[in-house]
Amino acid sequence: MSDDWKANLNIPAKDSRPQTEDVTKTQGKSFEEFGLKRELLMGIFEAGFEKPSPIQEESIPMALAGRDILARAKNGTGKTASFIIPALQQVKTKLNKIQVLILVPTRELALQTSQVVKTLGKHLKLQCMVTTGGTLLRDDVMRLDEPVHILVGTPGRVLDLAARSIADFSECPMFVMDEADKMLSREFKGIIEQILEFFPKNRQSLLFSATFPLAVKSFMDKHLNKPYEINLMDELTLRGISQFYAFVEEKQKLHCLNTLFSKLKINQAIIFCNSTNRVELLAKKITELGYSCYYSHAKMPQQARNKVFHEFRQGSVRTLVCSDLLTRGIDIQAVNVVINFDFPKTAETYLHRIGRSGRFGHLGLAINFIHWDDRKSLFNIETELGTEIKPIPSDIDRSLYVTEDEASIPRPFKIDELPKGNEHSRKRNGYEYRGQPTSQGFPQQPPQANTGYNQVPQGSPQAQGLQGSPQGLQGSPQGIPQGSPQGIPQGIPQGLPQGVPQFPQGYPQGIPPQGPQAYQNYQIPPQQVPAQFNGHSQYSQYQSQPF
């Protein structure tokens, strides 16, 4: 085949960052060898794809041959394109019916996946629709009156559309599940079973994930027809991601996080907490330190979640605090640092969290804050994953996680339009951040003190039990402060929510100190750290002082 048609393609600059064997150890195949439509090849190359990754080499030919597939590969190795490319190849644009259903567990992942479909298939003149909970059902009804070839959605909304006979899957030949382990958990499995009742018996099913528990095996035996099994998980951990832990008490975590902000070179960072309340409180504290920060969790209105996700993907802010909402499949290649502010309880959660950095075989950094209650979890995760999470050194070699040429980092596929939510619109400028995102290490002017704080009386239930917790996250706010948009902290809210910890003696009652300089006079007393910590012995340098 002549390559003249490639000459006029708008191909982005080559990604020059080093990659690990997870994506470079291939059989040397090219996308042209798969017999794909030229229009599809044009979209693939214009998206910056150069050659297939190992999972793509294994899965695309088998999917094109019509086989059911059960594929297991590491996070960030190209699983999404492994099912989107064969789906695009087999869609008949002249047939105005849903021909592919792609199910994903979260709304953010649905948005991202639909955009990959549109980007790779932009020369095919096909129609892709995304449908998730939290958006207006009538918008989906109106959209499905028009041709839709590929439907990307979350299980609950897809089942609703099918049960109401709004979406017709009776002639849909391809069924795809991404993050299949999550999709077949107790939360979703019953819904998936009901959705499949609307499909023809001779459908093709593609299941992709990084982990496959027993639930996936039972589903495969029941619903897949002699599936072709792919397992590229020779080890569970992700190559290219340097993993460290810092032993800190709860009240020292914010202090250590501030130190990391000043020492690390962060392109973009995701910070994980174990609860939605702690997500909001930590985002508020980071903003008080003078750093721009967004947050996201499952209890936020969908329109706010969409806005935060879109802004973070486009690089409008460097730091995102979130719950495990964004551990699944989210691909933002500029993220080079993941911080587990709260250490996860399971190896599966840990693996998906740190997999948000080091995408597609590139380098990344994962830092875990550990305290005494996390000893067992640390040991179990190291044992199950067969990896070592090392004590954090005083200086982390930047070559482990930094790309010197930041211009070479590919920008994410642009999301054309965000779905409208069904929640009430927020006030004017409800999503506007009242400060510009900062360069790393140079905090912007911190928010000005507000004299209208409610005082917490001495001896009251709110004040008792909170003394001595100056910077930690003991307690949690009750709801969202009035006037503070979802996901974007606006400095310090009016009043002190119940459960917010008190600050060092000498500060006015109920008024947190302002900006990084407010913490300079507060010395954290050194703590005694034992020599042994579940098999680790190098703890002498982590005695509560900044590392």
From Swiss-Prot:
Biased composition (Polar residues): 436-456, 521-547
Presence of keyword Hydrolase: yes
Broadest EC class assigned to this enzyme: hydrolase
Entry EC number(s): 3.6.4.13
Motif range (Q motif): 29-57
Location of the region described as Disordered in the Swiss-Prot/TrEMBL record: 1-27, 412-547
SUPFAM superfamilies in the record: P-loop containing nucleoside triphosphate hydrolases (SSF52540)
Ranges of residues in domain Helicase C-terminal: 240-400
Extent of Basic and acidic residues compositional bias: 14-27, 413-424
Single GO term (MF): ATP hydrolysis activity
Motif (DEAD box): 178-181
SMART domains: DEXDc (SM00487), HELICc (SM00490)
One Pfam family from the record: Helicase_C
Keywords: ATP-binding, Cytoplasm, Helicase, Hydrolase, mRNA processing, mRNA transport, Nucleotide-binding, RNA-binding, Translation regulation, Transport
UniProt binding sites for ATP: A73, K74, N75, G76, T77, G78, K79, T80
InterPro entries referenced in this protein's UniProt entry, alphabetically: DEAD/DEAH_box_helicase_dom, Helicase_ATP-bd, Helicase_C-like, P-loop_NTPase, RNA-helicase_DEAD-box_CS, RNA_helicase_DEAD_Q_motif
Localisation: Cytoplasm, P-body
GO biological process: cellular response to glucose starvation; cellular response to nitrogen starvation; deadenylation-dependent decapping of nuclear-transcribed mRNA; invasive filamentous growth; mRNA processing; mRNA transport; negative regulation of translational elongation; P-body assembly
CDD domains reported for this sequence: DEADc_DDX6 (cd17940), SF2_C_DEAD (cd18787)
Reaction catalysed by this enzyme: ATP + H2O = ADP + phosphate + H(+)
Keyword RNA-binding: yes
Written domain comment of the UniProt record: The Q motif is unique to and characteristic of the DEAD box family of RNA helicases and controls ATP binding and hydrolysis.
Function recorded in the entry: ATP-dependent RNA helicase involved in mRNA turnover, and more specifically in mRNA decapping by activating the decapping enzyme DCP1. Is involved in G1/S DNA-damage checkpoint recovery, probably through the regulation of the translational status of a subset of mRNAs. May also have a role in translation and mRNA nuclear export.
Membership in a protein family: Belongs to the DEAD box helicase family. DDX6/DHH1 subfamily.
Name listed for the protein in its UniProt record: ATP-dependent RNA helicase DHH1
Protein species of origin: Meyerozyma guilliermondii (strain ATCC 6260 / CBS 566 / DSM 6381 / JCM 1539 / NBRC 10279 / NRRL Y-324)
Chain's gene name: DHH1
